[in-house]
């Protein structure tokens, strides 16, 4: 499925006027506002996103669930990745890592892919004792055309554990030969090693300099193994430092100042971000996830670090990405992270990141997690299937279609509960996205007519750029829809369902959803669109 053709391109050539959007609503409590958007890329716009932008991080212990193996490849997962490739133009990059990356020890005699032991008093979500064998690397052969980031263990630090990590290098590099390797990673969230509830990994005296020295030493030892086993990958690079946040026990700016990139082997500056915690007091759908201001505040911490690093020339030519991110840390909260409201949050969060020079995002996944985009296998806790957040991934991918020169610009709106963005491809405006974040819940006892009747909508008015050309008659519309923000099923992007039950993740056009929608443009270039509460849309020019 590809984006709609650009039908107003002639309007944009040489256009000098702005777009003005005036959101109004049936609900008179909401104030109207107006904004302007230039037809060409604003001077202060972010850099183009990396291609692909929409990417994933998969918990190390659960990678075999998501990808399968040579005899049983996970075709469902691969189909969902292919769908996103069709939308954004490139298959998502996959980072294999997370907390269990730093628990995982290589066992050359293990016949299974993994051997996992849960310590339920600490975490029921993932194993704290984990070994992986040669069969683990079969999972790198099941998703054609996918590039991977493989995570090595930095957390375990005895001489025998380090040797086991190094013994795994030849298997990893041979599995990722032939264009499958994107980057390596060494360590997950080392800024929590001194404080983690899952176990203390380093003494309180461990500093940024200690971390940098250790990272440089171990990556040099990894490089020696690469030279021996996979010489063509000897100069492959890393994402780093993979900190949990920017305000923990290691300071990311100091870490770069201490020479993290002394070996010139870091391709991307990777940090992690979560809006809040699954069990934090006061976390709600409306105030935490469906809240544009909260998203802006969360991303602002990353942007501040990014600007300092840039100003001090500490990361020249090294893009800033989120190598792991999602809604609520500790695997998300049921009823929040798995709802359609979380899908809308994902659209807002990802597009806002793209507008702030965060060049790629890897949404974190793990079997049975609440915030996952899909559950790859059936378990006694979760059924196999496409989950609500995936549909948000699809809309973001569609908004970012266009190759290597796609830029996103935030269009500030008045309320916490709405957001809008413009997409520019090759310097030209091609799409506008509008997200309504007013929480609208529904109950299964409502009839379909009652649901439609009772659901308010907001009206957004755009003034399209003008030129001497004649205005095209209409713009095309694609909508992200569900019955309400609390829905966990029945979700569509542009009328497509990606449900496992319908066609194992292949796109299926539902007949009860309006598609092919076009909105007429007035002679004066004004176009109006109604966005039901708790929904979103893309207008393609």
UniProtKB/Swiss-Prot annotation:
Its main location: secreted. One of its GO terms (cellular component) is extracellular region. The active site is at 208 (proton donor), 324 (nucleophile). Keywords: Glycoprotein, Hydrolase, Secreted, Signal. It catalyses: a beta-D-glucuronoside + H2O = D-glucuronate + an alcohol. Optimum temperature is 45 degrees Celsius. Residues 1-20 form the signal peptide. Optimum pH is 3.0-4.0. Beta-glucuronidase that hydrolyzes beta-glucuronosyl and 4-O-methyl-beta-glucuronosyl residues of arabinogalactan-protein. Hydrolyzed heparan sulfate only very weakly. Has no activity on xylan from birchwood. Able to catalyze the transglycosylation of glucuronic acid (GlcA) residues from p-nitrophenyl-beta-glucuronic acid (PNP beta-GlcA) to various monosaccharide acceptors such as glucose, galactose and xylose. This is Beta-glucuronidase. It comes from Aspergillus niger (strain ATCC MYA-4892 / CBS 513.88 / FGSC A1513).
